[in-house]
Amino acid sequence: MEINIKKALIASAASLSALFCSAQQDLMVSQQIFSRINVNPAGTGNNKGCDAFLLGRIQWAEVDNSPKTGLLNFTAYSENVKSSFGATVNYDNLGVGNSQTNAQAVYAYHIDLNPKYILSLGISAGFNVGSFDPYKNTLKDDSEIGKSTYVKDKTTEISPDFNAGAEISSEHWMAGFSCTHFLNDTSTTFRKGRHFYVYGRGFFNITHNFDLAPLFSYMHKHNTNTTEIGCQAFFKKMIWGGVAWKPDFNRFSEMQMMSITAGFEWANRFRFGYSYDMNFGKYNNLPSNTHELMLSAHF
């Protein structure tokens, strides 16, 4: 099914205003809890060995020029120095000629508060590449050509970028706080503005085979206040499924999303996950064809 460019532009405007896969805002993905270093460099975990996390997301798949996202995280933990080292790279294509690529090196130091609790303090540094290509954008009004505001050539801007955060964890819960892009007061076409995150997750044994993991996250950026409230159920810690509600309380009637996730773990080493997101609110006439695939490995 084809959807005209007007709806494509509406979809892009919605993503800009509602925090979901916007080039001017951080990646909002439904399986972020499994790997967090792109939004909090302290969220590295402390398992010996290395972890690799790969995620791809396409939003509103039946809309022309729909947003597309790619994310790669890698971490390694050393008990000898109580530290984690890693890297995160993400690509966010807004779909109207605007894209951003962000790459950062990650470091986190772990402090054993007592036998039950671990505090992780993290920082990451790198660069952001923002690009606008007018040849990939379809104009609604050709009279814009020639105006002083019209960008006729592809433009790219490279800028430094830094994140910092903290995370405390135990056997049954974790909580974190972070700030991303803390050098940038505001967002532009070529870089993201400062974001603040608070999140938490529990992990509770219900029976010998079943566990529940309630989760909560909150993100603040200027006039955006997005919350995620959800829960995942695990069977033998190998198969999981969950649901989460993700509204922006500043634009509650305009855009909300409900995500349904499922996945499995094989040989205590490999994970595969899938998420399907549905639209609610003013833009619920857009197709609920947002798909997200996740692969991760521990070695």
What are these regions (language model features)?
Residues 2-12:
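Bacterial N-terminal signal peptides that target proteins for export
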Residues 24-299:
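Subset of outer-membrane beta-barrel
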